[in-house]
Amino acid sequence: MAKLYFYYSAMNAGKTTTLLQSAHNYRERGMRTLILTPKLDHRAGSGVVASRIGLRADGRIFERDTELQQLVERDIHNDGALHCVLVDEAQFLGRAQVWQLSEVVDRLRIPVLCYGLRTDFRGELFEGSQFLLAWADELEEIKTICHSGSKATMTVRVDAHGHAVQDGPQVEIGGNERYVSVSRAEFKKIMRGEGRIDPLQIALPLPVA
């Protein structure tokens, strides 16, 4: 039975790597997939989904007003049977788009796998994540680690000096240089202005020894 899945985490937990591995697993079995990626995230190039460890694949761009059920139906009409839809950066979906993806599952009987952040740099839910948490059939946390050694569940936006940024737009595309995953306790600490966090992390992919 097809289901709507939401795989969520803080930053740098390997969400896109997991998405690309899932897509590969389908293709390896002769099944066709469709990867959707938001237009506003063009860090790897327009329509390219890329992980920090060097994996990449082409995706279909969507915008806030894209009708996703219709997009999927057109894809099937043009290219034939579709076995799975995968959505990168799913936190950027709108409420209506999450509902449309649920229709892909319920009406078209195609599983939809969404990968994204749960909360923003203020600790508040993104719109897409809010409704995926409400409507998905299956929820799974992709875990990552805070510098303190605890599980990281929050994401902090930092400035060049490692201090928390508490103002600004919810959506601001950036990678390791702007965002750091931390535990809830560390999130509270840095948001109070107690200390700083080094935003620099080891560059990936790592060189082969």
UniProtKB/Swiss-Prot annotation:
Transferase keyword on record: yes
Residues given in the record as ATP binding sites: S9, A10, M11, N12, A13, G14, K15, T16, D88, E89, A90, Q91
Enzyme Commission number: 2.7.1.21
Active-site residues, record numbering mapped to chain: E89
Catalytic activity: thymidine + ATP = dTMP + ADP + H(+)
The keyword ATP-binding belongs to this UniProt entry's keyword annotation: yes
Keywords annotated in UniProt: ATP-binding, Cytoplasm, DNA synthesis, Kinase, Nucleotide-binding, Transferase
InterPro entries documented for this protein: P-loop_NTPase, Thymidine_kinase
Major enzyme class: transferase
HAMAP family according to UniProt: Thymidine_kinase
Assembly, per entry: Homotetramer.
Family from the record: Belongs to the thymidine kinase family.
Protein name as catalogued: Thymidine kinase
Species for this entry: Xanthomonas euvesicatoria pv. vesicatoria (strain 85-10)
Organism lineage string: Bacteria, Pseudomonadati, Pseudomonadota, Gammaproteobacteria, Lysobacterales
